[in-house]
Amino acid sequence: MSSIPNINWNDPNNGKSNTSRQSQPQPQLPSNVSPPNSRAVPTSGSIGGPQYGSSQFSNEYSRNPNTIGGPPFPLQSNQRGYMPNTGYPVQQTAQQRSGDKLQQVHSQQQQQQQQQQQPLYQQYPPQSVGYLAGDVYNPQHQEYVQMNQLPNQHYNLQQRQQAQGQQLKSQLNEQNAMMSASTQQYPVQDFTNPYPNAQNPAEQQQQQQPLRTQSQQWDGYQSQPLYSAAGNTIPSSIQQQIPPQNLSPSEQQQVKQQQPSPPEQGTKKKPGRKPKLRKLSESSSETPQVPKTASSSSSSPTAVNSGKPITKRSRMGCLTCRQRKKRCCETRPRCTECTRLRLNCTWPKPGTEHKNKPKDQKDDENTIEHAEFGRIKVLRGIVEYRSK
C-alpha cells in the first residue's frame, strides 16, 4: 500500500517519481488561490500534499479546473467556494478568506464602475394594443393613455369627458357670437354718392329690408344671400322656373305671355324625299318652310337649277356614276370619276332626277365607242376599256 505513489491528476508532473517532485523547490502559493482538493491544505505545504511546479500552472488550474461536473468557463474570484461540484473547499483558512473578501470588494467596485459607464435602461410595463394603434405623436392621446394605465393614479374618465364637453360648448358659443357679429347687416355704401341725404330715412329702410329678408336662420345656421346686395336681381332663367305667387290674374297673364311657348311637335317635319308624282309647284310652295341650314349646307349647283332644297339623302350625281353605283363628286360639266375613266358624263334634265329611264336608254349610256372593238359595254371597276 505504501509503495503506490500518490497520483494527482491535476498536477502537470503526473507520472513522475516523488523524488523528483520533492527535489524541486516548492513555490509559495498566493493567498487568494486554493488547491483543487476537497480538504483544507495549509499554505506552507507538506510532503504528502499536492505540490505545483510553478505559480503559472497553479493559477491556470485554479481558474479552470478539469473536474467532473464543473463549469467549462473560468470562475470568478467571488464564486470560489460557493459553486457546487467544483472541487473547491468550502472550509478555507482565515488568510484565504481575507484574500477572497478583498477580491470580492474589488470586483464589486469594478461592477459599479461598469454600471455607471453603461446607460441605464428601465424596463417599462407591457402596454395595451390601443396605445400602439393610436397616434404616438399626439400629446393629448399619450397623456390620456398614461393616466389610464398608471395603477397609482385614480382618474375618472367621466369627469374628463364632461370637462371636454364644456370646453367644446364654450368654443361653439364664442364662434356663434363671432359669426353673428361678423354677419351684422350694414347699409350698402354708395360709391357714387358717399354722403347720402339724411332727409330720406324711408329709402334707407327700404334698402335694408331686402338684406334682412334674404338671410334667414335655421337652428343657429346663418344662410348666405344667393345674390349680391348691390344687384338684388334674379336671372331671367331662374325667374321662369319659379312659379308666380301672390300675383293678380292680369300679372299672371303677362308672365305667361313673356314665357316662350314650347315648340309644337306636329307642325315641323324633317325635309325628306317627296313623292314622285308631286309637281314642281307644290314643292316650290313648300320651300319657305324649310330651315335655312339645309339650303346652306348643300353646295351643289343643282339647287340653283332645280330650285329644290338638296339634302344628303336626295343629292344625286351624274347618270353615269348612278348607273355604275359609284360616288359622284357632282362637278359639272364632267365629274372626276368620268374624267378619270374617260367616260361620257351625262346629267339628268331638271325635274327628271327621280324618274326611271327605259332600259334601252340605260344601255346606250353604259356603252362606249371603242377604236378597235367598236361599241362595247362599260364594266364596273375595269379601266382597260376606254374611249377617246
Swiss-Prot record:
Basic and acidic residues bias: start-end ranges: 351-367
Chain intervals with Basic residues compositional bias: 268-278
Pfam families named in the record: Zn_clus
Region listing for Disordered, in residue ranges: 1-120, 157-219, 236-311, 348-367
Location(s), subcellular: Nucleus
Keyword DNA-binding: yes
Ranges of biased composition (kind: Low complexity): 20-38, 102-120, 157-172, 204-217, 236-259
Top-level taxon of the source organism: Eukaryota
Gene Ontology cellular component terms for the protein in this record: nucleus
One MF term in the entry's GO annotations: zinc ion binding
Annotated keywords: DNA-binding, Metal-binding, Nucleus, Transcription, Transcription regulation, Zinc
Polar residues: bias regions: 1-19, 52-67, 88-97, 173-203, 282-294
DNA-binding region location: 318-345
Main location, first listed in the record: nucleus
InterPro entries per record: Zn2-C6_fun-type_DNA-bd_sf, Zn2Cys6_DnaBD
Function: Perhaps a regulatory role. May be involved in transcriptional activation.
Protein's name in the database: Zinc finger protein 1
